[in-house]
Swiss-Prot record:
Gene name, Swiss-Prot/TrEMBL: FMN1
InterPro entries membership: Riboflavin_kinase, Riboflavin_kinase_bac/euk, Riboflavin_kinase_dom_sf
Top EC group: transferase
Reactions the enzyme catalyzes: riboflavin + ATP = FMN + ADP + H(+)
Active-site residues per Swiss-Prot or TrEMBL entry: E124 (nucleophile)
Pfam family, one: Flavokinase
Gene Ontology terms, MF aspect: ATP binding; metal ion binding; riboflavin kinase activity
Role noted for this protein: Catalyzes the phosphorylation of riboflavin (vitamin B2) to form flavin mononucleotide (FMN) coenzyme.
A GO CC term assigned to this protein in UniProt: mitochondrion
Name of the protein in its database record: Riboflavin kinase
Enzyme Commission (EC) number: 2.7.1.26
Cofactor binding: number and manner: Zinc or magnesium.
Pathway recorded for this protein: Cofactor biosynthesis; FMN biosynthesis; FMN from riboflavin (ATP route): step 1/1
Amino acid sequence: MTVRDVDVPIPEQPGAPYPIVTKCCDIVCGFGRGSSELGIPTANVPVDQLPEVVNKLELGVYFGYAKVTPVAHDLEQVEREDGRVVSYNYGSHLEEDNGDLEVLPVVLSVGKNPFYHNDFKTVEIHILHDFKSTFYGAKIKFNILGYVRPELDYTSKEALIEDIKTDIEISKQVLDTEPYRAHMAELLK
């Protein structure tokens, strides 16, 4: 496993304050950077729909599991802050045969994205799964099981992408151990 100077040692099983388990949250459109600029799509959730403990977490990269659930709703076109129109399909294109509805591993950022000069906190969840379509408007329930590293600023997009890839590698290895896999069941309740 690649280890960087900024990585925090990850225990063999989650310890306080983990696990943190959310209720179902709305998946909303973000800035469109995860997919288009970085090649790393994220499911963005409103911070105000999360448990208060999430707001108290140190800014940085975390890992856990998530379950996406479609919502019965008509398709909508929603305008983002940048003026781009995004289709909200509420998860109507999620495919059970593709594994889209299973509990899936995630890497998530709780932060302000200093590379993009944000001055407000966001929670962006990268689900480690190959979805065939977007699912804005669907619901997501997720847990946070541990902390990888603090939020960093970057001098280049390439350096940011490389660190995200390392975050994914570390998270996959940890989440593939039984003490962490045992927490998948929390999302089925």
